[in-house]
Amino acid sequence: MAKSPSFSCTACGNVTSKWAGRCEACGEWNTIQQDAGISKGPAKSLGGKRGAAIHLTDLSTEETPPPRTTCGIAELDRVLGGGLVPASAILVGGDPGIGKSTLLLQAAAQFARSGLKTIYVSGEEASAQVRMRAQRLGLADAPVKLAAETNLRDILTTLEAEKPQLAIIDSIQTMWADNVEAAPGSVSQVRSAAHELTSFAKRRGVSIILVGHVTKEGQIAGPRVVEHMVDTVLYFEGERGHQFRVLRAVKNRFGPADEIGVFEMTGRGLSEVLNPSALFLSERGEPSPGSVVFAGIEGTRPVLVEFQALVAPSPHAQARRTVVGWDGGRLAMILAVLEARCGIPFAGLDVYLNVAGGMKVSEPAADLAVAAALLSAREDASLPADTVVFGEISLSGALRPASQTENRLKEAQKLGFTNAIAAAGGKPVGTSGIALNKMRDLTSFVGEIFGAG
């Protein structure tokens, strides 16, 4: 009996048994395509035929792990967990034009200069175009081998013959496997190409970096299984109106996840920013209502960013809630806690919240800084310019201490801040030179800082 066909959404990877004009999972139109599986074998069990026994090893061993290779770009090495691990597969995603190809071309040049045999394969540009960009970035003398190809079989044959230590594939969506009957960029093609390249990396000890396109929602396009296949998933983020870019690790088998590296886009490519807090606060002027500095932690790195809030009477029947750089659902929670526990209503008021510089913050410890910015804007009262705020707010109005308090305070002190407002409790800290004002609940915070509540 013939196997019934399956259909996949090219946007989200959802699999269905029949074709439809609109994907039921993500709602996208005209993205359903027939899925041609990778395997051509029969859809039966393995049966009684015996396979070869695999070689087993002990978990404990005296063999030293292969050393990491650093490229000299400190921010990239930090995100990778201390350097490039041999035989690792890395997926890098980001919006179009954000600088993925520029970053990886610079990384390829640095790795090649450090002694790694490096091959850069582009499926989107001709070799001459990649060479032009390398000349503009001052990388023309780097010993990097270039190729412009999309046929996966030819690429794997070339890698087998050249035996590089690092291969960069730009991008995985342009790769074409001739054993899969689907168009390049489809779910089947992306899954097959990622599987073949990842298997090659493990089998031959080659580090492979894959560039991935992203969807409108900011997720890497193609099936989610690709992110499970690779060892590391990096997102390259940034706002087009700002000069800096953030490389964020969302998965890393060989280092900390949520680590970030900060770069600045210049005429000569991407330059690393060793002190991102100073960059994010560089344009901060005199203290103004609604402006609060949050001492946050991104991965293992303390980062200071500015929250800006604006509260104004709403001319509409339903007040607006606009958030940039933070979670809108968490803003609604903070507004509800302020009204229920402190008696401060925001009904009939438009609320706008922004993280300055285009930075994205997801840490719960930003709750208290957001509440302070909202109250400062509503009461038209500025917080002192030398004060940082951090702490998590519970639904009861109690404040919970944040982790790594000492690292946050040290970073704030380094940038000239002398006061901090945080939740009471947690481990005692010994940072001198900065006064720490501990609050137990949101009511006491409102009463002491803003004289209300």
Where are these regions (language model features)?
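Conserved Walker A/P-loop ATP-binding site and its immediately adjacent core
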Residues: 123-129
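Conserved RecA-like ASCE P-loop NTPase motor core of nucleic-acid helicases/translocases
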Residues: 118-122
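Peripheral, non-AAA+ core regions of ATP-driven protein-machinery
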Residues: 2-11, 15-80, 85-93, 98-109, ...
